[in-house]
């Protein structure tokens, strides 16, 4: 499908249907609007490339999910509000901020694989060599290039793939947790999770459900982190449920 530009050319994406969008889909880190092609077919919907991904230009400054939500918010002005926000992973971080910032415009959320909270049991400490490198850098013993080399070696796949301002944004975002936003959301939320999600384990979804005023958690057996592409019809079922509640 053809790409269209939005928000004065700062965002690009694909529209589904001919009427104003009632569903807005926000993809994960390193992904694109294409992830939602199967789950949005036949709807009046919009799937965008978030700033810095696909063909949408990167932001001009470093910030977290709240900043990204403000960059995406103009999309709501062309929609048939209240909309259903669909957020996968990084896109879900934005969705909870949008629900807090523009509550009247959001009629429901469908979230999948979103690191909404820090893990109950944090992963192991960084490699000893990397920890030592950070300490030496802080003392001025090694330069920025040396530390960057260690980050490239020991950082996550997303970190290694990012560069420039997008890498700084990633570092900001992965340290965020959204207890405040979850408690403030009044719109109903469907949490659709793969039981094999190791990027945002199901225990995060269960704890998030307890913080939300109106939430439903569905676990998908044998499904990984990438629900939009590995289980698009399960995602569509949740979208249809939220749309039905708006009618």
Model-found features: residue ranges?
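Catalytic histidine-centered segment of alpha/beta-hydrolase-like enzymes
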Residues: 223-236
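Gly/Ala-rich beta-loop-alpha elbow adjacent to hydrolase catalytic centers
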Residues: 87-91, 95
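Hydrophobic, aromatic-rich cap/lid helix
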Residues: 152-180
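Active-site loop/oxyanion-hole signature of alpha/beta-hydrolase fold enzymes
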Residues: 47-86, 237
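Acidic catalytic loop of the alpha/beta-hydrolase fold
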Residues: 196-200, 225
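Conserved HGGG/HGGXW glycine-rich cap/lid loop of the alpha/beta-hydrolase fold
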Residues: 12-55
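Flexible "cap/lid" loop of the alpha/beta hydrolase fold
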Residues: 96-100, 105-139
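Short beta-strand/loop motif that positions the catalytic acidic residue
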Residues: 184-185, 191-193
């Amino acid at each position: 499908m053809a790409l269209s530009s939005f928000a004065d050319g700062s965002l690009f994406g694909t529209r589904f249907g001919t009427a104003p969008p009632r569903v807005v889909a926000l993809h994960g880190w390193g992904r694109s609007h294409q992830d939602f092609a199967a789950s949005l077919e036949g709807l009046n919907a919009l799937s965008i490339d978030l700033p810095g991904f696909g063909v949408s230009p990167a932001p001009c400054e470093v910030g977290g999910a709240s900043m990204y939500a403000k960059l995406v918010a103009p999309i709501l002005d062309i929609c048939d509000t209240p909309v259903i926000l669909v957020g996968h992973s990084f896109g879900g971080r934005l969705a909870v901020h949008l629900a807090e910032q523009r509550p009247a415009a959001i009629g429901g959320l469908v979230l999948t694989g979103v690191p909404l909270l820090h893990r109950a049991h944090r992963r192991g400490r960084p490699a000893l060599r990397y920890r030592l490198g950070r300490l030496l850098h802080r003392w001025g013993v090694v330069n920025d290039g040396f530390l960057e080399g260690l980050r490239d070696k020991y950082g996550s796949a997303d970190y290694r793939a990012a560069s420039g301002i997008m890498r700084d944004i990633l570092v900001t975002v992965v340290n965020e947790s959204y207890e405040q936003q979850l408690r403030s959301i009044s719109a109903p939320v469907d949490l659709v999770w793969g039981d094999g999600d190791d990027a945002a384990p199901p225990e995060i979804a269960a704890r998030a459900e307890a913080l939300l005023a109106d939430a439903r958690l569905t676990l998908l057996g044998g499904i990984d982190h990438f629900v939009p592409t590995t289980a698009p019809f399960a995602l569509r079922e949740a979208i249809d449920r939220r749309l039905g509640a708006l009618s």
